[in-house]
């Protein structure tokens, strides 16, 4: 069992190790649906025509690229991650894009101590980050700090399916088959055992919405995707 003190270092080293096969495993585990989920989140991100979008724990850049594809008005996208191998892959994928509609900059930084001024971005977003954090309240406070008044927070995360029967089937797959796939396909059983473990104590979608409200966000809403296995939460900074 990983202690709360050890978790940040453990998670960073884990993502450094799985970076080369991260995209492949996401596609295998979700049958490609993770691309659709990111596009759905991206539509929520660009709905207010933001000038600056901050993608935290951007990984290999897929959410940043989805935002670039969905945006109707020009915007600047800043992708932040603490894993150099992940950022290297994001930059390589960006370089290979045929059409670069808007600027994307990738930066190594700690999502709990962002090197950005107060009220400097229009949207803060992230995909599959929250389960890996030790202190959600600290993270939400930092996101609230860098958002401009009227700014939007959009997060996409694995969740507990609300329908009991399907939840049992999902847990059977997630807790047993996913680690086996990690072992057989990419030889990273430990990382893909950590993945379902990280969900066990994570709040369900309604409770995550409550945590956002308690951290000062307003107009909080969420919707389930992937038969209730993931959820996108949307919240606004009023002042």
Predicted segments — roles?
Residues 52-113:
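Class I SAM-dependent methyltransferase SAM/SAH-binding core
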Residues 9-10, 156-211, 215, 221:
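C-terminal alpha-helical "lid/dimerization" subdomain adjacent to the S-adenosyl-L-methionine
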Residues 112-123:
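A short acidic, Gly/Pro-enriched loop at the edge of an enzyme's catalytic core
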